[in-house]
């Protein structure tokens, strides 16, 4: 929760999540809210968090006004039609770890670790100032701020993908999205493209195509990286020999996902 708006993600049974959506839509303020729904076999979150923050996603530029200057929405079907037009530039506003495993074909990417790093790359983006900008992110939240930032810095024609990558995959089959979509829950990556799917990321150990993220089994390292299943067992889920020899290395169970100590999922 922040002054600029709300953003939330929940996980539950079909009945539970439907009751949640019905309850929100019963409030006139949320009657037209669009929910992005993914079906999964397991609960995606281990614990509930409600936070009040200065920004929904930290950007660090105080004067950006998402209510006045956010880019125009492009519905997924429209995006598919115009993304390859001349003088059009597709820009990915996600972190490097996200676009490493999946991105739109020919998209401009930024070497950022956090969304708040975007303003540092304004100089690089200036070369596209007179182009038609098509911005995208996972679900559309970050693009509200990123497109407003571009417009406030003189970019004239700025659009962003309504509903983000996830909605694009549902409504268009995900055509021309290479790889998988990174998500910030226990799933880590999800399939998007059922039309012309590819794998663009590679195992850090052997170099074979893989989109399988794990955390290093050495708790002190905990590096988040791509490791194929075979190399996972060979390296015991570690990113280096030093981590594999570490006395406090966690037992690798084939998933590379380790719950925080003292945390228990409640279903």
Describe these PLM feature segments.
Residues 90-92:
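Structural scaffold elements adjacent to functional motifs in cytosolic proteins
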Residues 138:
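Aromatic-flanked redox-active Cys/Sec active sites in thiol-based oxidoreductases
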